[in-house]
Amino acid sequence: MLNKTSILDFLSDNKLLLRERFHVEKIGIFGSFARNEEGPESDIDILIELESNVTNVFDLKWSLREFLKNQFQREIDICNTKHIKPFAKEYILKDAIYV
């Protein structure tokens, strides 16, 4: 069953792969899964920080989204912490759970 624990376990168990393949320095979840409020149609909200030398951010985010979508069989929204809009930052970060 897909829930907060199973998502966080997968992300934690695959930190090295995520770093090597997608240049992810930090990863976690926020939103409905982080709050245990997910429903059958809920997407998974992923919060990332990429290595500072990354130049192909769009391509990496797209590839990571597809990788996680295939793993979890859910839609994936990825938010880079460096690009959070000011009005949403507090709301997003208060729910964030990093691995």
Language model features with spans:
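Catalytic core of pol beta-like nucleotidyltransferases
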Residues: M1-K26, A34-P40, E51-V99
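Hydrophobic alpha-helical positions that pack around
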Residues: I29
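Short, aliphatic-rich beta-strand segments
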Residues: D43-E49
